[in-house]
């Protein structure tokens, strides 16, 4: 499949995979890509497959000359589902913001190398300052 920008989707998936363990290929559809990060374990006592994590997820949409994004912070539960919930712990919020910024910088550099822009989705209000 070729995206609106003319880039083959399969080639972009490979490049996105090289950014780290963020892309969820099974949740990517058409010109939309899904990334997430399990940044902070809520409780290490349960078995690994039963643990929950604080993290973020990002949806990226390919357009002709740019990719647009939106993201949310929340809880990745033991069933493997994301829920947007308020996070109260300052250390957790700081870690989520840090990992999101790190990923955002890598993603922006990759897309820039392909002559594509990375911009917030038109209806998305950016709660975290991602760039200087």
Curated annotation (Swiss-Prot):
Gene Ontology cellular-component terms listed: cytoplasm
Keyword flag Transcription: yes
Transmembrane segments: none
Stretch list, region Essential for activity: 99-122
Keyword annotations: Activator, Coiled coil, Cytoplasm, Transcription, Transcription regulation
Entry's localization field: Cytoplasm
InterPro entries for the chain: Tscrpt_reg_Crl, Tscrpt_reg_Crl_sf
One Pfam family hit: Crl
Gene Ontology biological process: positive regulation of DNA-templated transcription
Principal subcellular localization: cytoplasm
Domain of life: Bacteria
Coiled coil location: 90-111
Family classification: Belongs to the Crl family.
HAMAP family noted in UniProt: Crl (MF_01178)
Record function comment: Binds to the sigma-S subunit of RNA polymerase, activating expression of sigma-S-regulated genes. Stimulates RNA polymerase holoenzyme formation and may bind to several other sigma factors, such as sigma-70 and sigma-32.
Protein name: Sigma factor-binding protein Crl
Name of the encoding gene: crl
